[in-house]
Amino acid sequence: MTVEPPMRRERFETELLRWLNRRYLRPGASIGRETGLFQERWLDSIRILELIAWTERAIGRPIPDEQIRMDHFRSVAAIARTFAGDDP
């Protein structure tokens, strides 16, 4: 697995939205910053693993087990707040 340099929050959100919408595109629907990823059934047990792997690559480090909580992955905005930190 190639580890890339960490992304700033704004770029992280943009890239994550692009990745999610490309990967899980549904006719007539798209994922936004505040879309409920579990609530609207965009994520399942396999997709969350893919999302965790993508996030780890984007932030340049593994996510500790204790940070893998549903509330940290409920939306793109929540993921960015939790893992991408603030823009400098």
Where do the language-model regions lie?
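AMP-binding/adenylate-forming catalytic domain of the ANL superfamily
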Residues: 66-78
